[in-house]
Design a protein with these regions (language model features):
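Long terminal accessory regions outside catalytic cores
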Residues: 1-102
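Residue-identity detector for threonine
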Residues: 28-29, 166, 190
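Core AdoMet radical
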Residues: 171-187, 191-208
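Canonical Radical SAM [4Fe-4S] cluster-binding loop centered on the CxxxCxxC motif
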Residues: 145-186
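Generic, low-specificity signal for short hydrophobic/alpha-helical stretches with a mild N-terminal bias
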Residues: 71-74, 78-81, 134-138, 142, ...
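N-terminal [4Fe-4S]-dependent radical SAM core
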Residues: 31, 36-58, 87, 91-154, ...
Length: 208
């Protein structure tokens, strides 16, 4: 084991090569030879990765988006279907499990193993359940300003107070309603429970 950065550890693992662990306060990134990279939040939930020239990002609703350049050089963003999502997530978990077995076999006992154990709690089934739980905490978040993607969204109201723009259909499926104080406090409690330790990744608060 070699420390190669302030929070980065390098470990050589047979059959894999050099594996880098970036241990941040609220996230963990694992990189296999800088070719297969995947990262997780402080609770151990898979957040996304980069492999085979494709970037993946998992949303709080457990949808998985992939981004890549097509043969003409155009950037493509698309949500994968359930079969592909399951294959990717299970492959990541299998890789992490294999790394854990190698570390245990060589007598490693460290923060790296503690984080890996947290990651391995979140298999595909549990992440799917988390996606369902998301919709018990939030009404659909139709759109966010680009500078608020990493904010903690709190829904003090539902719908749009105007909702008459002919070019916008984001909130036509629901009436505008402001939550009363007790409702909003309960919403905040559910949000905090949902994010857990990973709430530290959120840079600001955005009220909807």
């Amino acid at each position: 084991m070699e420390k190669v950065g302030e929070n980065v550890i390098k470990i050589f693992i047979d059959g894999v090569g050099n594996v880098y662990f970036n241990l941040q306060k609220y996230s963990t990134t694992i990189s296999e030879e800088h070719k297969f990279i995947y990262y997780f939040d402080a609770e151990g939930r898979f957040m996304g990765g980069f492999f085979d020239g494709i970037s993946y990002r998992r949303g709080l609703d457990n949808r998985l988006m992939k981004k890549f350049f097509d043969k003409d050089g155009f950037k493509v963003k698309v949500f994968v279907n359930d079969d592909e999502k399951k294959r990717i997530i299970e492959d990541v978990i299998e890789r992490v499990s294999r790394i854990k077995n190698e570390l245990i076999g060589h007598g490693f006992g460290s923060e790296v193993l503690n984080r890996i154990n947290e990651i391995l709690k979140w298999n595909y089934k549990k992440l799917e359940e988390e996606g369902i739980k998301f919709f018990s905490v939030y009404k659909p978040i139709s759109i966010l300003p680009p500078d608020q993607y990493f904010s903690l969204v709190l829904q003090a109201a539902e719908g749009c107070s105007w909702n008459k723009c002919t070019f916008c259909s984001f909130y036509q499926d629901r009436k505008f309603r402001i939550k009363n104080p007790d409702e909003f406090l309960n919403h905040i409690k559910k949000v905090k429970e949902f994010f857990g330790k990973a709430i530290g990744l959120r840079k600001s608060i955005f009220f909807r």
